[in-house]
Amino acid sequence: MKKAVVVFSGGQDSTTCLVQALKEFDEVHAITFDYGQRHKLEIEVAQQLAKQLGVTAHKVMDVSLLNELAISSLTRDDIPVSHELQANGLPNSFVPGRNILFLTLAGIYAYQIGATTVITGVCETDFSGYPDCRDEFVQAMNQALAKGMDLPLMIRTPLMWLNKAETWALADQLGALDLVRHQTLTCYNGLIGDGCGECPACGLRQAGLKAYLDNRDLIMSALKSKQSAAH
């Protein structure tokens, strides 16, 4: 029996990955992390979608200790999300160590349930400057977890080399375009669906959707080319 653990936030990317995993695996376990993010609605959206999509199990883990260490606009209500980069060249929405912690816990969960695949929606193409969304980081984490648990673990990143328009094409290919567009929460200001239109996350999401809807055949063809190359 093929089992997978999907790191699931209820946003566009992780929901697309979850829908894809449900078509490929016999058992899909979703894991959502409560790290004190600004909007608890994110967790509620993840719970609703996991139930609606019919995952095998959905675990919500309290990792609020991250908020005690990591000062970020995503975890602190008194820090507005900014389009400007900080002195270190990173946006103020970067939560240091977040994906290190998330992938470690997802790997432990996979070990416990006998899964050898962890799926995450990180992407290097439109990664907002986050170093823990890069392929070299994921590869390093994959090696560390596999060695540390003596498990043939594979961290899969289906969106790693897709741009946002191609991610929308993938959702459409999976028959989930409307669900991803109207029921997911990507917005840093906590608005479901098309969002606020002003924060960096909404900017990426909306630009990608417009590009896809304006050039459906072209973008879908580009997606299929990347899928063929990956296999």
Swiss-Prot record:
Binds 1 zinc ion per subunit. Its EC number is 6.3.4.20. GO terms for molecular function: ATP binding; ligase activity, forming carbon-nitrogen bonds; zinc ion binding. Its cofactor is Zn(2+). InterPro entries: QueC, Rossmann-like_a/b/a_fold. Keywords: ATP-binding, Ligase, Metal-binding, Nucleotide-binding, Queuosine biosynthesis, Zinc. It comes from the Bacteria. It catalyses: 7-carboxy-7-deazaguanine + NH4(+) + ATP = 7-cyano-7-deazaguanine + ADP + phosphate + H2O + H(+). Pathway: Purine metabolism; 7-cyano-7-deazaguanine biosynthesis. Zn(2+) binds at residues 187, 196, 199, 202. Disulfide bonds: none annotated. ATP binds at residues 8-18. One of its GO terms (biological process) is queuosine biosynthetic process. NCBIfam families: 7-cyano-7-deazaguanine synthase QueC (TIGR00364), PRK11106.1 (NF008317). Catalyzes the ATP-dependent conversion of 7-carboxy-7-deazaguanine (CDG) to 7-cyano-7-deazaguanine (preQ(0)). Belongs to the QueC family. PANTHER family: 7-CYANO-7-DEAZAGUANINE SYNTHASE. This is 7-cyano-7-deazaguanine synthase. The gene is queC.
